[in-house]
Each structure stands twice: as structure tokens, then as C-alpha cells.
From Swiss-Prot:
It catalyses: L-methionine(out) + ATP + H2O = L-methionine(in) + ADP + phosphate + H(+); D-methionine(out) + ATP + H2O = D-methionine(in) + ADP + phosphate + H(+). The gene is metN3. Pfam families: ABC_tran, NIL. GO terms for molecular function: ABC-type D-methionine transporter activity; ATP binding; ATP hydrolysis activity. This is Methionine import ATP-binding protein MetN 3. GO terms for cellular component: plasma membrane. InterPro entries: AAA+_ATPase, ABC_transporter-like_ATP-bd, ABC_transporter-like_CS, ACT-like_dom_sf, MetN_ABC, MetN_ABC_transporter-like, NIL_domain, P-loop_NTPase.
Length: 341
């Protein structure tokens, strides 16, 4: 569906050339939600703006739906852009136009007649959950409602691809989840390919099928989201995964609990996919003569399956504890000893 081959973007500056995207290679399948994550300055925004040619690549080739979009110009490029919708961090709405008029705007530009425009706008208002707000102006809307308008406008011309440029970064956590749920619903209903960039691992976890990690213009790691959570390869990827698995509050809680258990061992278990549903602790207590205390745990869902972690205290004879740990390994659960007496 989308193919990037050795794509490079270099900006000219007084201080010298700046390579924003450095030999990027990506393949994004039709109908998937693909995330690109990186910190500020990683090259994410430059990368996504190459997809619809808001930025031209310095070198390399970009193919979308069997069309080499990096090689076309003029009317052919304008037509291609109608098949690629885009939403932005700060909404980019026309403040002098109502919700209906904002959504209708790309249809006007495309030359769609008035009756068809009206029908399409009604469909989109219903799709994004803005019934009753069609005559409101952007200044009368909440941040989440503004982004819903942006999504509806981006879908006006029935695009095959939706680009999301930090679309939830300006929203509070609750509204972020609502917008992510909407994007997930649109993806399932319309079979739309969604490419989003973000610096928040929560966004990747919640809706993406696969993820690419960017650092200093390079794509340093790609893979299914669950695989990346299971086995991050790069240091930057490990830091992003730790945003969810090792929060500061969680670490402080674990440290305070460890002080209460000077004997035995404190271990962290990582459950991925089907392992989440295995009765690991039940089997552990059945086959081991040790005491098992649960100190802390959480389970979360990704588009590829569940993952979770459990911090437990094992107390008993050293030999029995070691046998218990070996038994956990046999259950194919990842284990880390984080403290021992």
C-alpha cells in the first residue's frame, strides 16, 4: 500500500545541511494502523509530510497505492492528494466557518455539487459524533470536538490513507482516548490505512498494529507493537516502552515494598500475548514449598494482544526459590530478579 525506498530529506540552512530523514525504508500494509514514534527533532513530522508531498524528498522513492507519488506534479499530484487525508496537532480549522462549512471545504475545492456535498457532510458529522454541532463555530467547540471536525474534513473525499501529525498531543488524556477510539472505529469501518506520528507510547499501544521508532532522522527499529514491547532492541525503544511499564510512581512503590521484604527474592514477571491467561502463580504455589506475595501488577491491551507485568515476593528456602524460578521459565514467562535477601 505504502512503500518508502531509501528516502532522504535534507534542509538547507546557514549553518549547513540538516538531514531530517535519513535513508528511510518502510512498507505499510493496506488497512493497518502504523505508528511512528520519536522524540522532538527525530524527523517524524518531516517524514509524514513526505507522504502527501507537502515536503519533497531530496532522494528516494515514495509509492502509495501503486502510484509513485514522489515523481508526480501538477494536476496529477492534486488528484493524488485527494486520496490522502491529514489531521494536525492544532486542528488547522477555518475559524470563520461553521463545522459544516469546514467539513465541506475540501469538497468545494474538488468541485462536488452542492447536494452531494450536503449529503456527504451529514454522513461525516454522524461518523465522528458531532450531531447537533453542525452550525457551531470552532471557538464554540472543545479540543476533542475540534479534532473530530478535523477528522471529518480529512475524510471528506473518501481517502485511502489518513495521516495523523501528533493528532492527540494537544488533548487531555480522556479526550485523547476518545479520539483514538474514533480512529480505531474508522479504521475498522472503512478499512482506512492510518499512519500516525507521536511521542507518546500510550498512543502506539492503544491502536497501532506496527510501529517504527525514529532517532536523529533514522528509522532505528520497526515491528509489531507487541513484539516491540516484548523485546525492544534499541536504547531509545526501551525508554519508550518504559513510559508504560516502569513509571516513576511504580518504581517508587516497588522500592518501598522491597524494603519491607528483606528476605527471599522480589521478581518481576513479564506476560506477553497468551501468557497473560496462564495460571502461572497458581502452578507455582502448587509445585513449590514457598510463600508467594503479589506486590504490584498491571495488564494492558495492544492491537496485537495483551501484555502485563507482575511484581511478586518469593520467600522460603533458597533451593526452593531457585526451583520456583526455573519452573516459571518453563512456563515461558520472562522473569527478572529485582531484589534478593
Amino acid at each position: 500500500m505504502i512503500l518508502l525506498e531509501n528516502v532522504k530529506k535534507i534542509y538547507k540552512a546557514k549553518s549547513g545541511d540538516v538531514t531530517a530523514v535519513d535513508n528511510a525504508n518502510l512498507k505499510i500494509d493496506k488497512g493497518e494502523i502504523f505508528g511512528v514514534i520519536g522524540y522532538s527533532g527525530a524527523g517524524k513530522s518531516s517524514l509524514i509530510r513526505l507522504f502527501n508531498q507537502l515536503e519533497k524528498p531530496t532522494s528516494g522513492q515514495i509509492t502509495i497505492a501503486n502510484r509513485v507519488i514522489s515523481a508526480i506534479t501538477g494536476s496529477e499530484l492534486r488528484k493524488a492528494r485527494q486520496e490522502i487525508g491529514m489531521i494536525f496537532q492544532h486542528f488547522n480549522l477555518l475559524w470563520s466557518r461553521t463545522v459544516r462549512e469546514n467539513i465541506e471545504f475540501p469538497l468545494e475545492i474538488a468541485g462536488v455539487d452542492k447536494a452531494k456535498r450536503r449529503k456527504r457532510v451529514d454522513e461525516l458529522i454522524h461518523l465522528v459524533g458531532l450531531e447537533g454541532r453542525g452550525d457551531a463555530y470552532p471557538s464554540q467547540l472543545s479540543g476533542g470536538q475540534k479534532q473530530r471536525v478535523g477528522i471529518a474534513r480529512a475524510l471528506a473525499n473518501n481517502p485511502q490513507v489518513l495521516l495523523c501529525d501528533e493528532a492527540t498531543s494537544a488533548l487531555d488524556p480522556e479526550t485523547t482516548d476518545q479520539i483514538l477510539d474514533l480512529l480505531l472505529d474508522i479504521n475498522k469501518r472503512l478499512g482506512l490505512t492510518i499512519v500516525l506520528i507521536t511521542h507518546e507510547m500510550h498512543v502506539i499501544r492503544k491502536i497501532c498494529n506496527r510501529v517504527a521508532v525514529m532517532e536523529k532522522g533514522k528509522i532505528v527499529e520497526t515491528g509489531p507493537v507487541l513484539d516491540v514491547f516484548r523485546n525492544p532492541q534499541q536504547d531509545i525503544t526501551k525508554r519508550f516502552v518504559q513510559q508504560l511499564t516502569d513509571s516513576e510512581d511504580t518504581n517508587e512503590t516497588i522500592e518501598s515494598l522491597i524494603e519491607k521484604y528483606p528476605d527471599g527474592k522480589v521478581i518481576r514477571l513479564q506476560f506477553i500475548g497468551e501468557a497473560v491467561e496462564r495460571p502461572v502463580l497458581q502452578r507455582l504455589m502448587q509445585r513449590s514449598d514457598i510463600e508467594v506475595s503479589i506486590l504490584q501488577g498491571n495488564i494492558a491491551q495492544t492491537n496485537n494482544g495483551s501484555y502485563g507485568s507482575l511484581v511478586v515476593h518469593l520467600n522460603g528456602e533458597e533451593t526452593a526459590i531457585q526451583q520456583a524460578i526455573e519452573g516459571i521459565h518453563q512456563d515461558q514467562v520472562e522473569l527478572e530478579v529485582i531484589a534478593h535477601g
